[in-house]
């Protein structure tokens, strides 16, 4: 006996729940099938007496992320700003350098030129890549066959800019520079608003968090949908051969629907049997886009001692020996539960996973003591962590990455429906893909695709512009005249070389005219 509905949504993360809410609000009968014993997917808010609440998964929202800001406001959630009142720290070559702003200060003029050229070049290349179709970029194939390592080897002249660029890639996509396609990474940064927007706290992707945690987004939608959300129901089979689509779960329940939305990471499609089989390109795509590796760590202290030292808690930490590359203040907005959240990224997540939880905590405390220059960092009162690589119903975090050559070959099928199956999930977004914002955009777009297929809305209403959030307005990202026009290091050397040749030629000509050159 099967349960009948209009649409089955596979996956109860933010994308699936946003899709289900829109369809429900449009008068359709929706059922959400979630494999875990909770909703939220790659967002997860843990609650206990030691932490009150803490986001162990996706957490940050900021300006230009208007879908998630609108949805969360509808659900009655509020945001607060991540602390960045005091100074940030850039720790490199064993020393800490305080700074303010989005990027670390650079005083060496040659190094400054190289850093400036790095960010400018990535943004310039990104502007050539269409957000909704990166494979259509003029140099798409050339850039897609190149790893970010190869690109950075071409762009970076100094070791300083190279190391910061490696950290930037690790942090943005939780993968190594040799693992990801240059085309895909440049697209990823571009569709998040560029290097400054994605890297910044204030006026950037990490500006805010939700009071009470981001897990509430999915939880409050579940409250609205009631028993239409079925937990502990991993989907194992989708059959489209009949009049309706049949969806079977691991506990052998059957659900019958007119349409299905798959709102799980593409690779998790491999856990589902399809009848008829998936088309060739979709079948191969899902084997080729792994997720990144990250352990999220939160160290709690009695006091936010770093603030007393005029540090906000934001730390950019270079070096192979440092377990964490990036840290932020995670103290509650009322000042309670002082904490530092650190991201253990890419190969370091795989390396440190071999240690015990206690050993990881000690390494983190030792690092923070060194970077902050305070022994107080050695005395935590509590510790929480989440290794997303262990999650069988995520496969990793934050998002799926594209190795070289995959985007141009398979990217077109990411959002392409397969019969009556439509695809959501943050990976399929065109703006802030990889974030909660992208998850909402993708879920609502997939829902509207079904509404259009049912004849309820015209095709031009599938993709709708999202008005800017009134509560979290975006300030434009600006660059100075010098930042736009300063030469790169090779450009400067070429300029010096040409100037030297020109000067020598001019002096020779002048000497000749005045008869100062002696004939032999």
UniProtKB/Swiss-Prot annotation:
Family as reported in the entry's similarity comment: Belongs to the flavin monoamine oxidase family.
GO molecular function, one term: flavin adenine dinucleotide binding
Class in the EC hierarchy, top level: oxidoreductase
Important for catalytic activity (site feature) positions: 156, 365, 382
Localisation: Mitochondrion outer membrane
Organism field: Bos taurus
Residues bearing the modification S-8alpha-FAD cysteine: 397
Topology, Mitochondrial intermembrane side: 517-520
Subunit description: Monomer, homo- or heterodimer (containing two subunits of similar size). Each subunit contains a covalently bound flavin. Enzymatically active as monomer.
Organism phylogeny: Eukaryota, Metazoa, Chordata, Craniata, Vertebrata
Protein's job: Catalyzes the oxidative deamination of primary and some secondary amines such as neurotransmitters, and exogenous amines including the tertiary amine, neurotoxin 1-methyl-4-phenyl-1,2,3,6-tetrahydropyridine (MPTP), with concomitant reduction of oxygen to hydrogen peroxide and participates in the metabolism of neuroactive and vasoactive amines in the central nervous system and peripheral tissues. Preferentially degrades benzylamine and phenylethylamine.
Cofactors required: FAD
Topology within the bilayer: Single-pass type IV membrane protein
Annotated protein name in UniProt: Amine oxidase [flavin-containing] B
Keywords: Acetylation, FAD, Flavoprotein, Membrane, Mitochondrion, Mitochondrion outer membrane, Oxidoreductase, Transmembrane, Transmembrane helix
GO cellular component, one term: mitochondrion
Cytoplasmic topological domain residue ranges: 2-489
One Pfam family it belongs to: Amino_oxidase
Catalytic activity: a secondary aliphatic amine + O2 + H2O = a primary amine + an aldehyde + H2O2; a primary methyl amine + O2 + H2O = an aldehyde + H2O2 + NH4(+); benzylamine + O2 + H2O = benzaldehyde + H2O2 + NH4(+); (R)-adrenaline + O2 + H2O = (R)-3,4-dihydroxymandelaldehyde + methylamine + H2O2
Main localization (coarse): mitochondrion
């Amino acid at each position: 006996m099967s349960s009948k509905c209009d649409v089955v949504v596979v996956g109860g993360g933010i994308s699936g729940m946003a899709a289900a809410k829109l369809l429900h609000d449009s008068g359709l009968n929706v059922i959400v099938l979630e494999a875990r014993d909770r909703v939220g997917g790659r967002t997860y808010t843990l609650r206990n007496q030691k932490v009150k609440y803490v986001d162990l998964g996706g957490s940050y929202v900021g300006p230009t992320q208007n879908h998630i800001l609108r949805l969360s406001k509808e659900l009655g959630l509020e945001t607060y700003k991540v602390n960045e009142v005091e100074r940030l720290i850039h720790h490199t070559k064993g020393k800490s350098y305080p700074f303010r702003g989005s990027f670390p200060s650079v005083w060496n003029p040659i190094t400054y030129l190289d850093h400036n050229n790095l960010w400018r070049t990535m943004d310039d290349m990104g502007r050539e890549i269409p957000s909704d179709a990166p494979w259509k970029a003029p140099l798409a194939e050339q850039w897609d066959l190149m790893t970010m390592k190869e690109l950075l080897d071409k762009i970076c002249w100094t070791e300083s800019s190279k190391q910061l660029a490696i950290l930037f890639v690790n942090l943005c996509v939780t993968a190594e520079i040799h693992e990801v396609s240059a085309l895909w990474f440049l697209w990823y940064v571009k569709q998040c608003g560029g290097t400054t927007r994605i890297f910044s706290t204030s006026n950037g992707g990490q500006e805010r968090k939700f009071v009470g945690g981001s897990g509430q987004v999915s939880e409050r939608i579940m409250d609205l949908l009631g028993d239409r959300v079925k937990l502990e129901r991993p989907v194992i089979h989708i059959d489209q051969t009949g009049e309706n689509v049949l969806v079977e779960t691991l506990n052998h329940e059957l659900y019958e629907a007119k349409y299905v939305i798959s709102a799980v990471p593409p690779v998790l499609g491999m856990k589902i049997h399809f009848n008829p089989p998936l088309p060739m390109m979709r079948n191969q795509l899902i084997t080729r886009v792994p997720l990144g590796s990250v352990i999220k760590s939160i160290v709690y202290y009695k006091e936010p001692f770093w603030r007393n030292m005029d540090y906000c808690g934001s730390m950019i930490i270079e070096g192979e020996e440092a377990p964490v590359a990036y840290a932020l203040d995670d103290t509650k907005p009322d000042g309670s539960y002082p904490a530092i959240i650190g991201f253990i990224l890419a190969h370091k997540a795989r390396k440190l996973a071999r240690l015990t939880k206690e050993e990881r905590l000690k390494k983190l405390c030792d690092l923070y003591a060194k970077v902050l220059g305070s022994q107080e960092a050695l005395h935590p009162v509590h510790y929480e962590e989440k290794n997303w690589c262990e999650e069988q119903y995520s496969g990793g975090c934050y998002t799926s990455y594209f190795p070289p050559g995959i985007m141009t070959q398979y990217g077109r099928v990411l959002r392409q429906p397969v019969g009556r199956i439509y695809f959501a999930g943050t990976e399929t977004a065109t703006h802030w893909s990889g974030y909660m914002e992208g998850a909402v955009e993708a879920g609502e777009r997939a829902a509207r695709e079904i509404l259009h297929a049912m004849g309820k809305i015209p095709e031009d209403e599938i993709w709708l512009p999202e008005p800017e959030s009134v509560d979290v307005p975006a300030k434009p990202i600006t660059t100075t005249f010098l930042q736009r026009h300063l030469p790169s290091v090779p450009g400067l050397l070429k300029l010096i070389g040409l100037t030297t040749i020109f000067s020598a030629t001019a002096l020779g000509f002048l000497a000749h005219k005045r008869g100062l050159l002696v004939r032999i």
